[in-house]
């Protein structure tokens, strides 16, 4: 092949790759940036916050540890949430279903708890636990790293307990959460307080209220209130506009 033909072929290949470039990959480049990775972070930042490593299904036992109730005071969280009987709740990043089961007790058999996770192994664990305990109104859902895969307008309240800071695509996931909300539905972030140095959690696994609000307000969400009654976490609540 002559040099001229090689040049033409190269130009055509470049043009083709440009035309066929994924809109998602273009948006990713605009929305996220690479940063030095470390033991706790994935080397990717969103709004100047490095995203933390996700907890593997191999750490499932830690989610069911005996100390969790004392450390997190789930009883106080449930009081803050005040989930109504018959409500439809999305537990995003449900893990083993530790909170999904508690939400299910509040909404009762006429309600629904969508227990969403991206790890098939974790979904299998929570499904087995729900079946063993007789929670027929807990519906395990396998989501993706970009989408919780719930129907539009199907959820009254979406709750993320120590989850949002680990999302590989936080913008896209939160957009799908908002899409799933009924009019006036709520999104609840429960995160370890980055403002408090006494909270014994690694830095990338904590979030400040200001950072949560900054990221949430990129969507059709309006801050409603923040509750600080929990020992280590804050509960930041938004309402769909």
What are these model-predicted stretches?
Residues 133-146:
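Conserved SAM-binding strand-loop segment of SAM-dependent methyltransferases
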């Amino acid at each position: 092949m002559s040099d001229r033909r090689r040049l033409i072929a190269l130009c055509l290949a470049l043009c083709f790759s440009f035309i066929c470039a994924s809109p998602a990959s273009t948006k990713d480049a605009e929305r996220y940036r690479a940063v030095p990775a470390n033991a706790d972070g994935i080397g990717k930042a969103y709004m100047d916050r490095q995203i933390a490593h996700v907890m593997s299904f191999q750490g499932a036992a830690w989610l069911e540890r005996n100390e969790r109730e004392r450390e997190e005071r789930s009883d106080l969280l449930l009081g803050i949430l005040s989930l109504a009987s018959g409500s439809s709740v999305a537990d995003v990043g449900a893990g083993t279903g530790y909170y999904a089961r508690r939400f299910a007790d509040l909404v009762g058999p006429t309600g629904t708890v969508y227990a969403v996770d991206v790890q098939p192994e974790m979904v299998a664990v929570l499904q087995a636990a729900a079946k063993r305990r007789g929670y027929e109104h807990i519906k395990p859902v396998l989501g993706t790293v970009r989408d919780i895969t719930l129907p539009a307008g199907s959820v009254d309240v979406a709750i993320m307990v120590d989850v949002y800071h680990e999302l590989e695509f936080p913008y896209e996931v939160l957009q799908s959460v908002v899409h799933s909300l009924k009019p006036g539905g709520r999104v609840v972030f429960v995160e370890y307080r980055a403002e408090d140095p006494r909270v014994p959690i690694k830095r990338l696994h904590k979030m400040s209220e200001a950072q949560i609000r900054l990221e949430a307000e990129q969507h059709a969400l309006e801050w409603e209130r923040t509750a600080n009654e929990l020992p280590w976490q804050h509960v930041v609540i938004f309402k769909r506009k």
